[in-house]
């Protein structure tokens, strides 16, 4: 088995926070969030990272992240391009939004030759997640089922006090595998806990704080790439007429289909670390403070890549 590699999705642009979160400094020496994820990933055993970016941010991204990380890891780049579509499809007029997380991973298909983990560039996951992910990918291969995994977080460790968040709410089977993941696009905190709405706030449903949620930290075998690629044209045929400018091909969509078809089992690994991210501009000081605290406590050196 080839060693697991890490795929970092870094082509998006923050719609709520504004700007390029993936290269916005949060550390004492100008480090960005993904520096800390990569440091944790390297300690866990990952040696190769594939950044999925856009051509237009290539120079800025390499200067901000890629060049210094290359001192410690084997760094590769893949480019998520709007016009990378199956034969017979064209980019709808006026479309600028990327095609989603599944499309981002497919951009790296030719660089992946074994098991791989997927993360967002602008989420802080904590060291525990990378340890359990690397260990799982290193010891499991596809058998009669595709053997995949994901790392879940406690909902209360992933919410923002500054506004609503979107999270994949997970339901697990008794054996710890994933039954379903449902995207809740408006989850908010309130005085009694956490709740979500699906009708613009007309009604709300409470969610327990220990509900497992997905933060897009997935572990797949190479088989996933073929499945995602084969399904893309059908997804476009179904979704382009309904929402040509904003529909997105998400990873959980393919995962759910594979579970329902009985092709895959996804082991739900768990992290009790607190997630950090900049969903809103007001979240950034909290991230800076958390990184400063972890650095002072010795979890990270001041200079990660010295």
Model-derived features: positions:
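A short, conserved beta-strand element in the Rossmann-like catalytic core
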Residues: 14, 124-126
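Conserved core of the sugar-phosphate nucleotidyltransferase
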Residues: 127-215
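A glycine-rich helix N-cap at a beta->alpha junction
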Residues: 64-83, 141-146, 157
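N-terminal glycine-rich phosphate-binding loop and ensuing alpha1 helix
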Residues: 2-66, 75, 80, 114
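Short, surface-exposed amphipathic charged segments that create phosphate/polyanion-binding patches used
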Residues: 87-98, 163-168, 282-286
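Short phosphate-binding loop-to-helix
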Residues: 69-114
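Short beta-strand-to-loop acidic/aromatic patch adjacent to the donor-nucleotide binding site
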Residues: 114-124
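Conserved alpha/beta core of the MobA/IspD/sugar-nucleotide pyrophosphorylase nucleotidyltransferase superfamily
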Residues: 172-174, 181-306
């Amino acid at each position: 088995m080839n060693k697991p590699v890490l795929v970092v999705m870094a082509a998006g642009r923050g719609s709520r926070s504004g700007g390029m979160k993936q290269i916005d400094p949060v550390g004492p020496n100008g480090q960005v969030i993904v520096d800390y994820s990569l440091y944790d990933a390297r300690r866990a055993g990952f040696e190769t990272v594939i950044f999925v970016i856009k051509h237009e941010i290539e120079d800025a991204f390499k200067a901000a992240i890629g060049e210094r990380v290359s001192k410690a890891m084997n760094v590769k780049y893949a480019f998520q391009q709007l016009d990378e579509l199956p034969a017979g499809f064209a980019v709808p007029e006026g479309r600028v939004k990327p095609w989603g997380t599944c499309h981002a991973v497919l951009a790296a298909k030719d660089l992946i030759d074994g098991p791989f983990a997927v993360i967002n560039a602008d989420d802080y996951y904590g060291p525990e997640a990378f340890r359990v992910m690397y260990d799982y990918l290193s010891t499991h291969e596809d058998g009669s089922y595709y053997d995949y995994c994901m790392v879940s977080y406690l909902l209360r460790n992933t919410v923002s006090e500054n506004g609503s968040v979107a999270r994949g709410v997970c339901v697990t089977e008794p054996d710890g595998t994933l039954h379903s993941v449902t995207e809740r696009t408006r989850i908010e905190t309130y005085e009694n806990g956490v709740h979500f709405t699906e009708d613009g706030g007309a009604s709300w449903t409470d969610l327990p704080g220990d509900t497992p949620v997905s933060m897009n930290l997935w572990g797949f075998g190479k088989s996933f790439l073929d499945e995602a690629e084969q399904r893309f044209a059908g997804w476009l045929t179904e979704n382009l007429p309904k929402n040509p400018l904003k529909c997105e091909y998400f990873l959980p969509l393919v995962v759910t289909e594979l579970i329902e078809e009985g092709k895959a089992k996804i082991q739900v690994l768990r992290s009790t670390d607190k997630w950090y991210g900049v969903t809103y501009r007001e979240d950034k000081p909290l991230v800076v403070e958390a990184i400063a605290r972890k650095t002072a406590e010795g979890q990270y050196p001041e200079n990660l890549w010295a």
